[in-house]
Amino acid sequence: MNTRASKRPTALLPAKGWLAALAALVATSLVLAPGTAAARQGTVWLCKPGLEHNPCGPSLATTRLSNDGQTVEGKYTPPKIRRPAIDCFYLYPTVSDDQTDNSDLSIDPEERSIALYQAARYSQRCRVFAPMYRQITLKRLLQGNDTITPKMQRIAYQSALAGWKDYLNNFNHGRPFVLIGHSQGSFLLRKLIAEQIDSNANLRHRLVSAILLGGNVLVKKHRATGGDFKNIPACHSDTQLHCVIAFSTFNEPPPQDAVFGRVNGSLGSPVDPTLKVLCAYPGNSHLKTVLPTAPFAPGTTIGAATNLIGFAQPNATTAWAEFDHAYTGACSSAAGANVLQIAGNPGAPHLRSVPDATWGLHLTDANIALGNLTHIVKREQQAFFQR
């Protein structure tokens, strides 16, 4: 684990400072102009089968809890498939506290934590691959979006693309795969899918689904495709294949200037009346919220922000806590915003928007329905091999 002296987490700034960083978490990966790759360096794998320290391969022992997190309702360990027939390729969101414009490829506590929180649970269904990539850092975002250059954007995308190509050429061996991203990771996967997969019939056939959370995937109004992708539609059932699951989570009506769910020019999105932001969630409306019981890496920006959300503190000794009936949710297009609108059931904590209402529950996107999403991947896998 890296302990470089040059690393000074932005979480040590005053509250307004790191909240300002959060307010720009994903704004940098949207306008990704083509260009030359960053200096070549071999892929550093955050998650890969066989790694000695693999945050995507922990115990899956789980405690089912009451809505307030205090009463144990049961314990179980989901069985892992010994030889998974599919892979999951994951790009993590903006988490790096490196003190540079683009992160390096050293694995730090914040990357380990985010992989555990967002990707590890899929290991019961698939082999999980997650490359480190040179994302635009929180430190750079603190300087303001207008200071982010096309070069920084190219470095982030080309680094992620290099990880994808390494996986595809050296580890995939023709296997079906699921793509998983959140925030900056989703924006990068939008571009990668559009350029590398959408027009490639072979790869499109092997794409089980793409789970692109908190990333404002664009589609044509009144159509299943168009917008970001010409050939890959939205997922409308949990057995549909070669399609996209996408949503951003809110528990209050999204404001007119909401960062997610609207084609309003925020985060660099086009102001185009023929497009809409996709909300496609083919899971059960009774959300299975799943979280690690270990806290997010202390002393990091995202760790500090996560503490503000308000999830129940779990009374559990297992690696995971599951809240089976704390929240319900479904896609909503009320007031022109396409989002996953959730509501708390009795006893469930009211979750807070961080940094403000325009962001909704962005920091919960990957976990609020994680149990449902892993079940969808199971159903999709069954459908893929039963064709």
Q: Which residues does each predicted region cover?
A:
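Gly/Ala-rich beta-loop-alpha elbow adjacent to hydrolase catalytic centers
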Residues: 181-185, 189
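Surface cap/lid and interfacial helix-loop subdomains adjacent to catalytic sites
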Residues: 159-174, 194-350, 378-379, 383
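Bacterial N-terminal signal peptides
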Residues: 18-31
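Active-site-proximal beta-strand/loop segments in catalytic clefts of secreted hydrolases
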Residues: 91-94, 132-136, 182-183, 212-216, ...
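N-terminal secretory signal peptides that target proteins for export/translocation
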Residues: 1-15
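Active-site catalytic motif of lipid deacylating hydrolases and related acyltransferases
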Residues: 49-52, 81-84, 90-176, 337-387
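N-terminal signal peptide c-region/cleavage motif recognized by signal peptidases
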Residues: 33-36
